[in-house]
């Protein structure tokens, strides 16, 4: 049986609509606490402890309180990190030997949305069977622990400082960032107190933007999903590079001095090239169904195996573990380097790219010389939840028409989002006009068939 609540990245939705309601989130905390109480590795007589972090959405306060109450009712102690990047929660959970970590965030989504995602004690996303166990507990009545068995809550001292030091530790000790002017866009999100300090403490001249969260402006015209603000700031300040994170700082996009934007596909290629230069060989790397065909060709030309996973960083991670490889990425900016962190980390990924540039003495454009991305057109078609599109003859006809026209020179990919009620229509072609024309035709067929 499929999961009812957990998607590809936890549980997510619009605040106030099921399941992102205070009563459900309280029960979710209780259910997760009961599962942890039965599986956590703790000393006899001790209680499991979970860490809760959040991004800057106004609803985070409400959902944090609900989660805290649920865990306490289940007899689980809680540590509160406050605003903290998703990868920061993963790191601190592992470093502090806690039973689990929880992030309250909807990542790149607008502020009316929010979500809950969990990390296991080792800083990895929960396996499917644990999520299924939590869902099973949601069907059971909430039976509060007796007063002497309730969990306690406390703030984690200097959570931001601990994570800042971890990020800096991933940058080579022989290098620094002196002489480099960086614009750092934190999307008014979870990294606003962290990211500028990391790059500044390594020596960079940092110009921060997107660092004034008010509860309502996360990802609003800033960050990795809206890079125009960063591109303008880089040019206006004559900066060397710009770094864009998303609302929970697990995604990365980079802008160079000319204003050119580099996505996760291109940054993966840069990191693979750096590993080849330092280690002599990279056996393989993982992308997704959305990874640009030009990057796959370039990696194979460099002698690197390339495997495509389903879209979602958890699936990239699964493929990396399956093959025993280190590097993987999504074009959206989730970049995994498993010898540095257990999950995608926008700040750490930026430091890895900066280290690659330092070692090579090249610019990003020079490191990507000869790699010309195929134009891609991505259209998100909003649909009613549960709308059926797979059996539509008109949609199938539009897809087949595009595939026939692009045979051997492009790709068509249609998939439902795992986090939003949208159908993603992606067409890749050698000519941008062809990609746009076919994507728009398919999107219009979807709209007509699912109206």
UniProtKB/Swiss-Prot annotation:
Q: Which residues form the active site?
A: 107 (phosphoserine intermediate)
Post-translationally, this protein is described as follows, namely:
Activated by phosphorylation.
Q: How is the cofactor bound?
A: Binds 1 Mg(2+) ion per subunit.
Biological-process GO terms, alphabetical: carbohydrate metabolic process; peptidoglycan biosynthetic process; UDP-N-acetylglucosamine biosynthetic process
Task: Mention one GO molecular function.
Answer: magnesium ion binding
Key word Isomerase present: yes
> What is one cellular component GO term in this UniProt entry?
cytosol
Q: Which residues carry this modification: Phosphoserine?
A: 107
Gene3D superfamilies, per the entry: Alpha-D-Glucose-1,6-Bisphosphate, subunit A, domain 3 (3.40.120.10), Alpha-D-phosphohexomutase, C-terminal domain (3.30.310.50)
Residues that bind Mg(2+), according to the entry?
107, 246, 248, 250
Q: What domain of life does the UniProt record list for this protein's source? A: Bacteria
Q: Which reaction does it catalyse?
A: alpha-D-glucosamine 1-phosphate = D-glucosamine 6-phosphate
Cofactor names:
Mg(2+)
Family affiliation: Belongs to the phosphohexose mutase family.
What protein name applies here?
Answer: Phosphoglucosamine mutase
Origin species, per record, is Burkholderia multivorans (strain ATCC 17616 / 249)
């Amino acid at each position: 049986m499929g999961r009812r609540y957990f998607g590809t990245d936890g549980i997510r939705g619009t605040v106030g609509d099921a399941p992102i309601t205070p009563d459900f989130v309280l029960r979710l905390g209780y259910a997760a606490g009961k599962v942890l109480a039965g599986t956590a590795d703790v000393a006899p007589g001790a209680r499991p402890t979970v860490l809760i972090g959040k991004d800057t959405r106004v609803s985070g306060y409400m959902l944090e309180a609900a989660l805290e109450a649920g865990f306490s009712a289940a007899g689980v102690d809680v540590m509160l990190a406050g605003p903290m990047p998703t990868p920061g929660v993963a790191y601190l959970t592992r470093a502090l030997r806690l039973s689990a970590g929880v992030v309250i965030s909807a990542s790149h989504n607008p502020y009316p949305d929010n979500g809950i995602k969990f990390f296991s004690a080792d800083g990895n996303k929960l396996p499917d069977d644990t999520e299924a166990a939590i869902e099973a507990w949601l069907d059971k009545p909430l039976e509060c622990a007796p007063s002497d068995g309730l969990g306690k809550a406390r703030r984690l001292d200097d959570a931001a400082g601990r994570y800042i030091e971890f990020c800096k530790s991933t940058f080579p000790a022989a290098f620094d960032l002196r002489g480099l002017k960086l614009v750092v866009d934190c999307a008014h999100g979870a990294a606003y107190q962290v990211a500028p300090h990391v790059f500044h403490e390594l020596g960079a001249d940092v110009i921060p933007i997107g660092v004034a969260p008010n509860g309502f402006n996360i990802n609003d015209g800033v960050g990795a999903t809206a890079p125009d603000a960063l591109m303008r700031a880089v040019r206006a300040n004559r900066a060397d590079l710009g770094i864009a994170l998303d609302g929970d700082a697990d995604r990365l996009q980079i802008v160079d001095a000319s204003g050119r934007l580099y996505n996760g596909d291109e940054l993966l290629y840069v990191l693979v090239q750096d590993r080849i230069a330092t280690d002599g060989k990279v056996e393989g790397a993982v992308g997704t169904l959305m990874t640009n065909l030009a990057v796959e060709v370039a990696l194979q030309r460099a002698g690197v195996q390339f495997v495509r996973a389903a879209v979602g960083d958890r699936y990239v991670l699964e493929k990396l573990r399956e093959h025993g490889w280190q590097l993987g990425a999504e074009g959206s900016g989730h970049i995994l380097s498993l010898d540095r962190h257990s999950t995608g980390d926008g700040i750490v990924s930026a430091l890895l790219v900066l280290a690659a540039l330092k070692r090579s003495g090249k610019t990003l454009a020079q490191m990507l010389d000869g790699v010309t991305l195929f134009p891609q057109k991505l259209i998100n078609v909003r649909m009613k939840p549960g709308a059926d599109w797979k059996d539509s003859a008109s949609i199938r006809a539009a897809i087949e028409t595009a595939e026939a026209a692009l045979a051997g020179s492009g790709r068509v990919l249609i998939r439902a989002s795992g986090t939003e009620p949208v159908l993603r229509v992606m067409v890749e072609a050698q000519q941008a006009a062809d990609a746009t024309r076919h994507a728009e035709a398919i999107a219009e067929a979807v709209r007509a068939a699912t109206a």
